[in-house]
Amino acid sequence: MNKYFAICPRGLEELLTEELRSLGAQYLKTTHGGVHFSGDWTLCYRANLESRLATRILWFIAQAGYRSEDDIYKLAAKQNWPDHFDVSRTMRVVTTAIKCPLKSLDFVTLRVKDAVCDTFRAKVGERPNIETRNPNVR
């Protein structure tokens, strides 16, 4: 079972929770700006296609505590990115945070991008291209 986060406009979280529940989502947790939930890939697709309230569905790949940008790099580098998308696909890393203790989210974004590219280079021998306007993977 996968973990997801459905983003919605503020004030609609409770309605989104009920909508996701009606689609079959489990372990729902309402928070500011969205709803955490669990389910299979079919549910993820249904939520993306049928939700009238969610603006985006995010898939949790990993989660851990951190103290520095290096901790985030190490967590991102542990993921087997070639299992998630092909090196021929273009990518973009987007970082958002609330009350982040780190100095620069732009630097965090670069470190995550570096970790993904370094993992591809180590496992596949090449890295994906970066496309900031219209990437295949974000």
Task: Tell where the protein language model's regions lie, with residue ranges.
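Accessory substrate-recognition/RNA-binding modules or partner subunits associated with SAM-dependent
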Residues: 2-137
